């Protein structure tokens, strides 16, 4: 995205386009599901195939807004964590984040994601206290988490990079 700096504060802009896909009457997918098909596109990136969540008459093979919201939170935490660890001189780190969101839908059809749970598993030879502190700082730094109204809970696990694959 583009950016500008005013009084030490930087502002960055990001843009993309969401476009419908035309309905194809020769396909076995129902027109109702096809009507929810769309493509997310942005300069220099491959297109992302989207739909509604399957529970809302979408297609399970396509990304839905709820998953993309969840992915943006998990990805932002990961990148914030890597920033903190790199800044603090922590060497090689491997982090996988499992994420879950709770969507509550009212009888009126209005809904909101009320909670997000991120469970990062970090494999490194750095000491666990350093990694836990880095996760806490990453929570505070994450641009996306700072922009949402639902609760975002992070429950990190730290594994030794030289240990076997047993979870601790």
Show which residues each predicted segment covers.
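Extended beta-strand/beta-hairpin segments
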Residues: 3-71, 79-168
């Amino acid at each position: 995205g583009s950016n500008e700096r005013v009084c030490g504060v930087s502002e960055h802009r990001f843009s993309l386009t969401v476009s419908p896909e035309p309905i194809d009457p020769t396909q076995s997918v129902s027109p109702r599901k096809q009507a929810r098909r769309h493509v997310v596109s942005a300069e220099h990136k491959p297109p992302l195939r989207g739909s509604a969540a399957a529970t809302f008459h979408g297609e399970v093979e396509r990304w839905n807004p709820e998953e993309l919201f969840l992915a943006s939170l998990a990805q932002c935490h990961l990148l914030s964590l890597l920033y903190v660890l790199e800044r603090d001189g922590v060497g090689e780190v491997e982090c996988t984040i499992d994420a879950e969101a709770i969507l509550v839908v009212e009888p009126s059809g209005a809904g909101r994601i009320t909670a997000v749970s991120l469970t990062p598993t970090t494999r490194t030879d750095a000491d666990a206290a350093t990694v836990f502190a880095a996760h806490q700082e990453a929570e505070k730094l994450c641009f996306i988490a700072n922009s949402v109204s639902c609760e975002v809970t992070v429950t990190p696990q730290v594994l030794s990079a030289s240990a076997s694959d047993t979870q601790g």
